[in-house]
Amino acid sequence: MNKIVFISLLAGVSLFSADYSSVISSPNASKLIQKDLLAPATKYTMPAGCITKDPNAIARGAFIFHNLNGKKAKKKPPKGLSRKQMKPGVTYHQGDKIPAKQYGNCIACHNIEGAHGAGNIGPDLSNYKKTYIDSGARNYQFVFQKIADPRIDNPKTNMTVNLTTKLFTTKEICEIASYIVSPK
């Protein structure tokens, strides 16, 4: 009997439920979607002098690799990096809030020497120079391209697209690449 009463109640509710389709708006999201689409994969040429042994550049690359930034960031960025980044084309006035610069947080997916809490989604980058560069399996251009826009040889990659989206500058990508291939 309980089953019959329950089924009767369900049937009654479904017969008298309100039709809300006329009050729910359905905006055309095409423009929003187009704005969020990534530009096509872009092939980049590494600039001359990109890979460096300069300890300051390597320190900046390491900071970008190991940190995300934001309000909870604890470490102070090395000389030449800022916690804030002005957006191109935006005029700032005294007292305006300048947005935080987002760093790579590459460590969330990759392991590398000295990493704490490294991820395992992306390849392990430990001993990269010895394993890949010195052996001839990869070159510096490959490292630069993988950081700039990894979709060139892997269209379905989960890695962030950094130069094409302007998340990083060419200089920052060179510094990250210099850190990855540097002795640790």
Residue ranges and their predicted role:
Residues 18-24, 92-94, 118-130, 148-173:
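Axial heme c-ligation environment in periplasmic c-type cytochrome domains
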Residues 39, 47, 135, 150-151:
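Short secondary-structure boundary micro-motifs
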Residues 50-58, 99, 118, 136, ...:
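Solvent-exposed, acidic/flexible segments
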Residues 63-73, 100-112, 124-127, 141-148, ...:
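C-type cytochrome heme c attachment motif
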Residues 72-76, 136, 154, 158:
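Secondary-structure transition/capping residues
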Residues 81-144:
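Gly/Gly-Pro-rich "capping" loops immediately C-terminal to redox-active cysteine motifs
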